[in-house]
Amino acid sequence: KLLDIDKEKLPEIQKSYEIVGKVSAQAAAETGLSTNTVVITGGGDMFSMLYVSGLHRKGSAVDITGTGGVISGYTETPVMDKRIMNLHHVLDGWVPFGNIDAAGVSFRFLRDVLCKKERDEAREKGIDDYAYLCQIAEKIPAGSDGLYFLPYLMGERTMGSADSRGCYIGMSMDKEIGHFIRALLEGVAFEFKRTLDIFEEHGNDIQAVYHVGGGAKGDLWNQIKADIYEKPIYTLQTDEGGVLGVALMASYAVGLIDDLVAKAEEVVKIRKIYEPNQNNFGVYREMKDAFTELHDTLQKPFKHMARVQEKYR
């Protein structure tokens, strides 16, 4: 009504696991499928993946750290807060989420710009680039001796401005390359922690976080996130993506399985659990507060920087 859109021109809303028709004659001819093959509504790739990555019960969250990053919860109703976004889940309920456009890609940027020597050393030794960088970062204490990284290399969406930019803050003469690596891993986790806090501010208790994507491969980043989130981090044996989720919904639609939640419990196989280290809670809580203060304080300078750059581009 607000946008004056004729409702009759919009498709009927269906559940993701409902049958909406059968394969057309044309599609059957092009694919070889029978015209008796049913078609279900299905769901978006992210939400189909979330369903089989731990987001099948309330009280859980999923951290997807790939090139970009998304952290999502699962709630009965939308979390009405302008700092995050909400979309309907493929199951009954809603997925509130926040994102970082430059999550894993920040790590790649660091590797290729500031850590070329270390990257080349890793390759000479036959070690994965990122695993080698994490070995260096492991020698640095939690909190990176006061070095902060703001992971806004590609700006922000709802938590800030598209003009936001990546920053290292707290540099001093005692910092080594390991500080820069660890601070980056912590900075991404601090940003996601802000979103988790919003979920819980609205009464949604998060008991565990499932971690998937390339960022979930290394022990150090998983442990940093467990310590900053103050939640156990669950990594999975396999990462099937949305294809498995849609396959299960189709199976449910035709009666091959009778409980989508129970089936998710069956297929979500845990690889390793990272328990939070309470010894790091103090430093990370205070640093997260300082991180948020830095973020908020820099919004005005970020806009000024963007105006200057645009003027002299």
List each model region and its residues.
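Active-site core segments that coordinate phosphate-bearing ligands/cofactors
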Residues: 1-4, 18-313
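Divalent-metal (Mg2+/Mn2+/Ca2+)-assisted nucleotide/phosphate chemistry catalytic cores
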Residues: 7
